[in-house]
Swiss-Prot record:
Part of the anaerobic respiratory chain of trimethylamine-N-oxide reductase TorZ. Required for electron transfer to the TorZ terminal enzyme. Belongs to the TorC/TorY family. It comes from Haemophilus influenzae (strain ATCC 51907 / DSM 11121 / KW20 / Rd). Its main location: membrane. The keyword Electron transport applies. The chain crosses the membrane at residues 9-25. Heme 5 binds at residues 316, 319-320. One of its GO terms (molecular function) is iron ion binding. This is Cytochrome c-type protein TorY. Residues 1-8 are cytoplasmic. Residues 26-368 are periplasmic. Keywords: Cell inner membrane, Cell membrane, Electron transport, Heme, Iron, Membrane, Metal-binding, Transmembrane, Transmembrane helix, Transport. Heme 1 binds at residues 39, 42-43.
Length: 368
């Protein structure tokens, strides 16, 4: 009887020992597989390692270094265990040679980045917040832009990864020729009787005297008719007195419709003159008859807007979450786009189209 009791005690102690050993072993394995040395032991991880070593998260004036696990593995709880198990797929991919060289790595960079961004968005940038906290920020010591952005982020419930993409690892390239995407999406020459038509891009037009009028993307013509491969229509807009070279869509809002040469400015019909208190200047409401190539105009405003939104989503989401058009006023969008365009691969025509799309759908504009 005593031996039976002793046997049970020994068995229980052995089970406890096995449990403790398994728990300690699991913790040891999880810890060792979270080190930069382990992460970079796979050949495919040498590429992100080089990017990390060139970033401020590796070396900085403060002497603080963020390890791989600091950003990619939540510190505790279910998210921690989940991250470790999901990481097993990386070992499988390494064995299969999915990203065995630089070319394959680049081919999958966007896919990998989107997965990480999605996870960080879902957990409210948990790993970022283990070091960075809104509560600990002294906004008064930040730059004007950082202070404004962080204040808006707190108000709107945004999370770190919404804006802070590409600060350690290179951003994925936006593949595909945007002009090719546009030509397949916005076909000029698609016209519907009785509806307004819009320029698909910046295009040269002329007035009835042959003077040049350059229409901007989204420039609207009314009372139009087809004449062979040309369209005759009426452009309606506003000019600021003293700066008549530019025709704007609305009074006081600098949404460019057209640029006119010196002779063309003298051949417009002035409908009325209004003093605008905001700009403290006089504005002329005008109309002008123009001739333009049929292939450069469309009635399909929906598809044209989809193209503008596509530019916003693909080009402007590399560094931060794409900002909705109704976030800023029409005039504010000019400065916002100009301050960020050099960080994208957009060409001048694309910048122009994006700016006007955002302006037309700004928060102080009626739904377009």
């Amino acid at each position: 009887m005593a031996m039976s009791k002793m046997k049970k005690i020994v068995t229980a102690l052995c089970l406890v020992g096995v449990g403790v050993g398994a728990l300690w072993g699991s913790q040891w394995i999880m810890h060792k597989t979270s080190t930069p040395e382990f992460c970079a032991s796979c050949h495919s991880m040498s590429y992100p390692q080089q990017e990390w070593e060139g970033s401020s998260h590796f070396a900085n004036a403060k002497g603080v270094r963020a390890q791989c696990s600091d950003c990619h593995i939540p510190k505790e709880g279910w998210h921690y265990v989940k991250a470790k198990f999901i990481a097993l797929k990386d070992l499988w991919y390494e064995a299969q040679g999915k990203i065995e060289n630089k070319e394959k790595y680049e081919a999958h960079r966007a896919e990998m980045a989107q997965r990480v961004w999605k996870d960080m968005k879902a957990n409210d940038s948990e790993t970022c917040r283990s070091c960075h906290s809104f509560d600990a920020m002294e906004l008064s010591k930040q730059t004007k832009l950082a202070k404004q952005t962080h204040t808006e982020a707190q108000t709107n419930g945004q999370t770190c990864i919404d804006c802070h993409k590409g600060i350690v690892h290179f951003l994925p390239e936006v593949h595909g020729d945007q002009n090719t995407q546009k030509s397949s999406a916005v076909q000029g020459g698609t016209l519907s009787d009785g509806s307004a038509i819009f320029a698909t891009e910046m295009v040269k037009a002329t007035n009835d005297k042959g003077n040049e009028v350059r229409l901007m993307p989204y420039a609207e013509l009314m009372q139009w008719k087809v004449d062979g491969d040309q369209i005759q229509g009426t452009l309606h807009g506003w000019q600021q007195v003293g700066a008549e070279a530019v025709v704007y869509q609305e009074l006081g809002k600098r949404i460019t419709l057209a640029l006119m040469d010196e002779d063309a400015r003298n051949h417009v019909q002035v409908l009325k003159i209004v003093h605008d208190a905001v700009t403290d200047s006089d504005w002329k409401e005008i109309s002008v008859a123009v001739n333009v190539a049929k292939e450069k105009m469309t009635s399909d405003l929906t598809t044209l807007n989809q193209y503008g939104n596509q530019l916003n989503q693909t080009q402007c989401s590399g560094c931060h979450a794409a900002i909705g058009a109704d976030h800023y006023t029409a005039n504010q969008w000019i400065g916002v786009v100009n301050s960020m365009k050099d960080r994208t691969s957009m060409k001048k025509d694309e910048v122009r189209a994006l700016t006007i799309y955002l302006q037309r759908n700004a928060k102080d504009m009626a739904k377009q």
